[in-house]
């Protein structure tokens, strides 16, 4: 098989994998919001407060590390990778705009969920490629 064909199939597999990841993240996020966040007004309010605090840099990184350690029981993310993700989230105007819409009591659209899923998968892939030191 020629190098051109090998490269084509390699890129096809990467794209399919990426597309699948985005689809899974979007579906999971949508289900979580619709089934657990939006219906539960108390939880929704608390989550929106935390997201707002995050957007306003009111949460210390050490607290974010502890939260990630709790959620990421296999410890796949180093603090450096978490810092990368924090920076990526807070420095993307479209992400912060979308999160502010959520905080302001708006139901996120399917387009917004697609955008967030694409962004999260891209940045997680980039974070996993960083050296863990």
Swiss-Prot record:
- Where does the record place it? Virion; Host cytoplasm; Host nucleus
Q: Tell me which GO cellular component terms the UniProt record holds.
A: host cell cytoplasm; host cell nucleus; virion component
The principal location of this protein is: virion
Which Pfam families did the record assign? Answer: AcMNPV_Ac75
Q: Does the keyword Metal-binding apply?
A: no
Q: Is Nucleotide-binding found in the keyword set?
A: no
Q: What does this protein do?
A: Plays a role in nuclear egress of nucleocapsids and intranuclear microvesicle formation.
Self-association and partners: Interacts with protein Ac76.
* Protein name as catalogued: Protein Ac75
Which superkingdom heads the taxonomic lineage of this protein's source?
A: Viruses
- Mind listing the GO biological process terms from this record? exit of virus from host cell nucleus by nuclear egress
Which key words are in the record? Host cytoplasm, Host nucleus, Virion
């Amino acid at each position: 098989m020629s190098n051109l064909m090998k490269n084509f199939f390699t890129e096809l597999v990467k794209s399919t994998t990426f597309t699948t990841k985005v689809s899974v993240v979007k579906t999971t996020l949508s289900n979580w919001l619709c089934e657990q966040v939006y219906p539960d007004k108390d939880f929704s309010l608390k989550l929106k407060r935390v997201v707002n605090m995050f957007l306003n840099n009111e949460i210390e990184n050490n607290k974010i590390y502890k939260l990630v350690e709790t959620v990421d029981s296999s410890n796949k993310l180093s603090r450096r990778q978490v810092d990368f993700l924090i920076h990526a989230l807070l420095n993307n105007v479209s992400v912060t705009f979308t999160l502010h819409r959520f905080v302001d009591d708006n139901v996120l659209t399917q387009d917004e969920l697609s955008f967030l899923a694409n962004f999260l998968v891209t940045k997680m892939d980039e974070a996993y490629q960083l050296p863990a030191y």
